[in-house]
Curated annotation (Swiss-Prot):
<comment type="function">
    <text>Glycoprotein that regulates critical steps during fertilization and also has immunomonomodulatory effects. Four glycoforms, namely glycodelin-S, -A, -F and -C have been identified in reproductive tissues that differ in glycosylation and biological activity. Glycodelin-A has contraceptive and immunosuppressive activities. Glycodelin-C stimulates binding of spermatozoa to the zona pellucida. Glycodelin-F inhibits spermatozoa-zona pellucida binding and significantly suppresses progesterone-induced acrosome reaction of spermatozoa.</text>
</comment>
<dbReference type="InterPro" id="IPR022272">
    <property type="entry name" value="Lipocalin_CS"/>
</dbReference>
<feature type="glycosylation site" description="N-linked (GlcNAc...) (complex) asparagine">
    <location>
        <position position="46"/>
    </location>
</feature>
<feature type="glycosylation site" description="N-linked (GlcNAc...) (complex) asparagine">
    <location>
        <position position="81"/>
    </location>
</feature>
<dbReference type="GO" id="GO:1902491">
    <property type="term" value="P:negative regulation of sperm capacitation"/>
</dbReference>
<comment type="subunit">
    <text>Homodimer.</text>
</comment>
<dbReference type="GO" id="GO:0005576">
    <property type="term" value="C:extracellular region"/>
</dbReference>
<feature type="disulfide bond">
    <location>
        <begin position="124"/>
        <end position="137"/>
    </location>
</feature>
<dbReference type="GO" id="GO:0032725">
    <property type="term" value="P:positive regulation of granulocyte macrophage colony-stimulating factor production"/>
</dbReference>
<dbReference type="InterPro" id="IPR012674">
    <property type="entry name" value="Calycin"/>
</dbReference>
<keyword id="KW-0964">Secreted</keyword>
<feature type="disulfide bond">
    <location>
        <begin position="84"/>
        <end position="178"/>
    </location>
</feature>
<dbReference type="GO" id="GO:2000359">
    <property type="term" value="P:regulation of binding of sperm to zona pellucida"/>
</dbReference>
<comment type="similarity">
    <text>Belongs to the calycin superfamily. Lipocalin family.</text>
</comment>
<dbReference type="InterPro" id="IPR002447">
    <property type="entry name" value="Blactoglobulin"/>
</dbReference>
<dbReference type="Pfam" id="PF00061">
    <property type="entry name" value="Lipocalin"/>
</dbReference>
<dbReference type="GO" id="GO:0036094">
    <property type="term" value="F:small molecule binding"/>
</dbReference>
Amino acid sequence: MLCLLLTLGVALVCGVPAMDIPQTKQDLELPKLAGTWHSMAMATNNISLMATLKAPLRVHITSLLPTPEDNLEIVLHRWENNSCVEKKVLGEKTENPKKFKINYTVANEATLLDTDYDNFLFLCLQDTTTPIQSMMCQYLARVLVEDDEIMQGFIRAFRPLPRHLWYLLDLKQMEEPCRF
């Protein structure tokens, strides 16, 4: 009996496919993402992407604007030349309704991990063109109110992602010039 359980356990472990980004299970309702968002926390598997204010993915997503073509315009702010600069990035729809192709510095894909539309959105930007894929995920909120339960959900959402070492930047504990 013990041998059977061990064999079954090994078969289950070996049969697990390569891990992809876990995503929200419900169908995405893109129009419900429209509006203002606030960066609450960031996580990355590559600290150089957000270690300093000028780091390439130290960005604050401030709004999402769905287009009639089911694309997604991402409005973000970042620190450049000693001031906060607004950038607009177009996310082009793909076969997967939760993934968008983007062209932004060191990221070529935006993925929506999870959302309830009214309170939070977990979104990741990543570079899928390099052998070691760099990724930055954000916990976005509709209002600037701390919610420990959602923060724990964010941590659970990015933990199973590829790469074992993650760096978490909790924005409620620091001053950020481009966080509105």
